[in-house]
Amino acid sequence: MITAEKKKKNKFLPNFDKQSIYSLRFDEMQNWLVEQGQQKFRAKQIFEWLYQKRVDSIDEMTNLSKDLRQLLKDNFTVTTLTTVVKQESKDGTIKFLYELQDGYTIETVLMRHDYGNSVCVTTQVGCRIGCTFCASTLGGLKRNLEAGEIVSQVLTVQKALDATEERVSQIVIMGIGEPFENYDEMMDFLRIVNDDNSLNIGARHITVSTSGIIPRIYDFADEDIQINFAVSLHAAKDEVRSRLMPINRAYNVEKLIEAIQYYQEKTNRRVTFEYGLFGGVNDQLEHARELAHLIKGLNCHVNLIPVNHVPERNYVKTAKNDIFKFEKELKRLGINATIRREQGSDIDAACGQLRAKERQVETR
């Protein structure tokens, strides 16, 4: 729930007249109802309408009194996302460009796997981290999303899957934006979708990825939540990582590893390192050896990512043979590593690419 204190703390939050009803955790809905002189058990009914029956309006909540429905309408909106573009890949990946109520656009991706359906969600409109290989940073950061706007991405995809009686089984927070720069809303989102009164998606089926906002890594380590944790690393040496990710100048590799060690001491959980391979930049055997030396001794897994080409960026894909050699060298050195399966390569699958293309069309 967005309070005045939250707005003061998070200057990039939108200033809507009413906040999304999806931004309330179950306990917050209970407390709000009691404050309004309503019965606490109504929260369960409201959440059933929102997350099991997945209604699009408060008026459809027919087992609530008219007075309570009006009270809800006076204070909240049922956030709806308008589909601007839908691209479907031959491998079943679907990329959505959604329009928010203030006209900004965001991306959400549905990825189909043998083990279920995964949704990649966005946490910000744009991004200010400035990774030099990423289309998400084109145009900078416009604003943060409310927790309810992040929840709505999952719900909107779930509604599309309802027609074929499928369900969203995994969530990855790897879309546009840096989740740890919208930390409180991200945490509310996690607690909402994990709640068995809501979508009941297991914590171990949810992954949060960060570019390495070190203070928030310490905060995340102290949270009582079993969410999977991933770090975009992409290079073991500061010189190369700073070139790829300017955030490294503020939070360098040494400090990042220290924060990850703290996370593991607190949680005893494995960390995934995401390592995008860029031709001639970080994809040689010497880079694999540097990476292995850096993370040796950590409980970790390396996810090697053959990057999607972004026309606005100059990086090129690593040759397939070099990718296999890189993986083989890591394994030889005792590092658990896999190559991520490419999905959506025949559509605008790179993070932020579809939104960037749409912005170009709008400004012509």
UniProtKB/Swiss-Prot annotation:
What's the EC number here?
Answer: 2.1.1.192
Q: Where does S-adenosyl-L-methionine bind?
A: 177-178, 209, 232-234, 308
Q: What InterPro entries does the entry give?
A: Aldolase_TIM, Methyltransferase_A, RlmN_N, RNA_MTrfase_RlmN, rRNA_lsu_MTrfase_RlmN/Cfr, rSAM
Q: Which residues form the Radical SAM core domain?
A: 113-346
> Where does the protein principally reside?
cytoplasm
Q: Per the entry, which co-factors are needed?
A: [4Fe-4S] cluster
| Disulphide linkage map | 120-351
Task: Provide this UniProt record's keywords sorted from A to Z.
Answer: 4Fe-4S, Antibiotic resistance, Cytoplasm, Disulfide bond, Iron, Iron-sulfur, Metal-binding, Methyltransferase, rRNA processing, S-adenosyl-L-methionine, Transferase, tRNA processing
- Determine if rRNA processing is one of this entry's keywords: yes
Q: Which reaction does it catalyse?
A: adenosine(2503) in 23S rRNA + 2 reduced [2Fe-2S]-[ferredoxin] + 2 S-adenosyl-L-methionine = 2-methyladenosine(2503) in 23S rRNA + 5'-deoxyadenosine + L-methionine + 2 oxidized [2Fe-2S]-[ferredoxin] + S-adenosyl-L-homocysteine; adenosine(37) in tRNA + 2 reduced [2Fe-2S]-[ferredoxin] + 2 S-adenosyl-L-methionine = 2-methyladenosine(37) in tRNA + 5'-deoxyadenosine + L-methionine + 2 oxidized [2Fe-2S]-[ferredoxin] + S-adenosyl-L-homocysteine
Pfam families given for it? Radical_SAM, RlmN_N
Q: Which residues form the active site?
A: 107 (proton acceptor), 351 (s-methylcysteine intermediate)
Q: Name one GO molecular function term.
A: metal ion binding
Q: Give the cofactor note text.
A: Binds 1 [4Fe-4S] cluster. The cluster is coordinated with 3 cysteines and an exchangeable S-adenosyl-L-methionine.
Q: Where in the cell is it found?
A: Cytoplasm
One GO CC term on file = cytoplasm
Which residues does the record give as [4Fe-4S] cluster binding sites? 127, 131, 134
Misc remark for this entry? Reaction proceeds by a ping-pong mechanism involving intermediate methylation of a conserved cysteine residue.
| Membership in a protein family | Belongs to the radical SAM superfamily. RlmN family.
Protein name in the entry: Probable dual-specificity RNA methyltransferase RlmN
Source taxonomy: Bacteria, Bacillati, Bacillota, Bacilli, Bacillales
The gene coding this protein:
rlmN
